[in-house]
Amino acid sequence: MEQALKQAKIAFDKNEVPVGAVVVDRLHQKIIASTHNNTEEKNNALYHAEIIAINEACNLISSKNLNDYDIYVTLEPCAMCAAAIAHSRLKRLFYGASDSKHGVVESNLRYFNSSACFHRPEIYSGILAEDSGLLMKEFFKRIRTVISSHRMT
């Protein structure tokens, strides 16, 4: 999770929503993908950290199934990312801060408990949640400050 948090800080510095994700090979305890949100730079709403990490991992192992892999994410996944986690069959999901607005693991929809979900990873939440949450709060505080200063001019 520390590596995911490092990625989130990189996103923060790039004015991206500070979410980081890593995919780990469970058997060898090795990170095979380490990324962060990149929606602003790519001008593409699909470039969430989880989607990029899953894509990189699948390309690396030449398989769409990540049964022997775990994903660590600094923020509770949204609907798109939760579906990608299910479709790629990741074994375990570890995430940091809850997302009361868009999170669908435990905060809202509870996607992995729905009949629409055909694969449910083991779920572990609250890992480095305070660090992840503070980074998100600082990011959106900065955004609000920029918006306020533009309104004044």
Swiss-Prot record:
Its EC number is 3.5.4.33. Its cofactor is Zn(2+). GO terms for biological process: tRNA wobble adenosine to inosine editing. Binds 1 zinc ion per subunit. Zn(2+) binds at residues 48, 78, 81. The active site is at residue 50. Keywords: Hydrolase, Metal-binding, tRNA processing, Zinc. CDD domains: nucleoside_deaminase. It comes from Rickettsia conorii (strain ATCC VR-613 / Malish 7). Gene3D superfamilies: Cytidine Deaminase, domain 2. It is an enzyme of class 3 (hydrolase). InterPro entries: APOBEC/CMP_deaminase_Zn-bd (IPR016192), CMP_dCMP_dom (IPR002125), Cytidine_deaminase-like (IPR016193), tRNA_aden_deaminase (IPR028883). Pfam families: MafB19-deam. Belongs to the cytidine and deoxycytidylate deaminase family. Homodimer. It catalyses: adenosine(34) in tRNA + H2O + H(+) = inosine(34) in tRNA + NH4(+). Catalyzes the deamination of adenosine to inosine at the wobble position 34 of tRNA(Arg2). This is tRNA-specific adenosine deaminase. GO terms for molecular function: tRNA-specific adenosine-34 deaminase activity; zinc ion binding. Residues 1-116 form the CMP/dCMP-type deaminase domain.
